[in-house]
Amino acid sequence: LIKKTPDYHITINMASVRCDGLESAASFADAYNFYPTDGMTLFQRSGDEYFRIMGGWDVTASPGVTAREGMDKLVPVENWRGYCSRSNFAAGATDGGSNAVAGYIFEKMNASAKEGVNDKGNSEGLNEVLYGFKAYKSYFILGDYMVALGAGVTNKRPELDGEIRTTIDQTAWTDEVFSMKREKMELVASGTHSLLSADGTPLWLVQKGKFAYRILPEYTREAFVTCETRPTDWVKRNKVNEKKQGLPSEARILRLWANHGQRPVDDTYGYVVYAGRQIPSDELPFRVLQNDTLVQAVCSMDGKVVEAVLYPGNKGLQAEGLSLSASAPCAVLIREEAGEIVVSVTDACMNAALKGIRIVLNGREIKVPMPQGMLCGKPAVIRVDRMTNQ
């Protein structure tokens, strides 16, 4: 899922079992492509927020990714199929405007382990730090806000070293960083700090000229920020860098993350990133309707935009003033405009036999035909009159 405006670029990358991941080629190119399709979420304004610091990245803290910490345990490999999720559930929906929704069930696997693979590389049996945990991850874009929700975060291998964490961002630290509450800003010093104030309320964390971050404390128990300078090893990341001169010996990094601990079972997280140029308000312009392993959903405060990820086994969404259900697992975006309801739906399992999905919104049935053939899995967008089904 990509949102691009003249001022910023947001990318969210997910790979279900239907897809392969990004290849690694330790002997001659990228050696650490372990996490790019694990829900990686990138926020860019100048375009160089990440590649200028890649040499010093903690790869296990890739932005947007839920993972076990342990950069020192990663072994570079050649893996021509990359990594994906064991689940067939992944979807994104948008009507082409300023809003979007995406979500997937994440439980990492090596794509080379699929049947019929004849180019496995040398990754089999290596890097157990990558595996053994699960999360339901969703993303909601409402204007200049990106909301991320997680549920069912469970460590299935708690005997392995390393806590489970969800990284909010790991980006270039290029300017002053402030914490903000009630529009009062305080400079954040280097080191590690909580993203909650002393009284337990959330703070906005703002990097001057870049993006603003805030956790949703009802879903996030612990979250931290660190401003740090790390040594780089560009050649270790990619052999091609042997031929490059003048690469920086250290990287200044701003990193934010939610911590799930060593033994999470059905843990959650929630955070928001503001990409606009204004000072973000303490009053958020949206509310979370549900965040669990059945439904993850958000709506705008005026109720004109509703976004939901409906997982297998769900019984629909019931919230104050709103009921929503679907006849198949999907991602749904509903937007009101000038006498119409714009409905965007994506089949999350890319079922080629599925001809349509029936949406029931506040008791009203809306039938949405699914794209067929080579367009299977594409968002379907329909417009209906607010008063009739025409």
Residue ranges and their predicted role:
Residues 1-354, 360-365, 379, 387:
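Extended polysaccharide-engagement surfaces of secreted carbohydrate-active enzymes
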Residues 384-390:
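Mature N-terminal, pre-catalytic/accessory segment of carbohydrate-active enzymes
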Residues 366-374:
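Solvent-exposed serine/threonine-rich low-complexity stretches and specific carbohydrate-binding patches
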